[in-house]
A protein has these predicted regions:
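An N-terminal hydrophobic leader/cap segment in hydrolases
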Residues: 2-49
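Acidic catalytic loop of the alpha/beta-hydrolase fold
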Residues: 208-212, 239-240
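Short beta-strand/loop motif that positions the catalytic acidic residue
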Residues: 197-198, 203-205, 209
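Membrane-embedded segments
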Residues: 51, 55-126
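Short alpha-helix in the alpha/beta-hydrolase fold that links the catalytic acid
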Residues: 85, 190, 199, 213-222
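Gly/Ala-rich beta-loop-alpha elbow adjacent to hydrolase catalytic centers
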Residues: 138-142, 146
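Catalytic histidine-centered segment of alpha/beta-hydrolase-like enzymes
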Residues: 236-247
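Catalytic active-site module of serine/aspartate enzymes centered on a nucleophile-bearing elbow/loop
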Residues: 245-263
Length: 263
């Protein structure tokens, strides 16, 4: 009698490495998130449509000002973690579109560098129909996503919190004995893209950031064209409240985004 047992499914080494490295980069929270209206009064649940056919959950928080901010999250959690910052921006007159990438917060698909770029483009397409002036805000890994989008579709302003030169450089700092360049397929080479930026740039870094050292953020900033501004938050580590949504960070973002409204 012939065996019905299935043979194991082997992946080519390069694809296997790619699958494994993504598990070390992306840390999505499982399950869905609550309704936007329960987060902030007037919040709207919206759906983004990507070019490759995915439907992604998002929140839109309208405000009275002229500008909207497209927020690109970091590599962990979901948009609920960024709600306090979104609320602070709305209180200061900035509308906010806050979305989750593929594979995050119950969204279909699996995250990858090109996939997250497609998700950000879908967010920009949606926001184009709801605001005349759009600024981008990206944190950590999301800073690389926002920068790539900014080169493709220039915003009124680009604001990056804890950005890095490349994911390869971050990996080398944390794993100096590993051949990081050979292991990573998602490299997020922001340093190679930023010279083509055509928008005002704000970079915010934590002086004690243990995940993305401020030196990497400064190197990226130094490679960018003018106009630009660099802000160092004293004593702040990567996930400290003062760097996530502290008063200084909120004030810098609001000031920079609103300055882009002036002719």
């Amino acid at each position: 009698m012939a065996s019905t047992r299935k043979s194991p499914r082997w992946l080519p080494p390069r694809r296997l490495i790619g699958a494994l490295q993504r598990r070390l980069i992306y840390f999505p929270s499982p399950g869905s998130v609550r309704s936007a209206a329960t987060v902030l009064r007037g919040g709207q649940d919206v759906v983004l449509h990507t070019d490759d056919g995915l439907r992604l959950g998002a929140w839109f928080f309208p405000a009275d000002g002229h500008s909207a901010v497209l927020m690109c999250n970091g590599n962990a959690g979901d948009r609920c973690m960024r709600a306090p910052l979104a609320a602070a921006l709305v209180r200061n007159g900035l509308s906010v579109l806050l979305f989750d990438y593929r594979g995050y917060a119950g969204n279909p698909g699996r995250p990858s560098e090109d996939g997250l770029a497609a998700d950000a483009r879908a967010a920009r397409t949606w926001l184009d129909a709801h605001s005349d002036r759009i600024a981008y805000l990206g944190e950590s890994l999301g800073a690389a996503v926002a920068l790539r989008l900014a080169v493709e579709h220039p915003p009124s302003a680009l604001m990056l919190r804890s950005p890095f030169t490349s994911l390869t450089d971050v990996g080398r700092l944390h794993y100096p004995r590993l051949p990081v360049a050979q292991l990573l397929s998602d490299r997020y080479p922001s340093i190679d893209r930023i010279e083509n930026l055509g928008a005002p740039l704000l970079v915010i870094a934590g002086a004690r950031d243990s995940i993305v050292p401020a030196e990497l953020s400064r190197r990226l900033y130094d490679a960018a064209p003018e106009p630009k501004r660099f802000v160092l938050v004293p004593g702040a580590d990567h996930n400290d409240p003062e760097l996530l949504d502290g008063p200084e960070v909120v004030a810098e973002i609001v000031r920079f985004a609103q300055a882009s409204e002036r002719p």
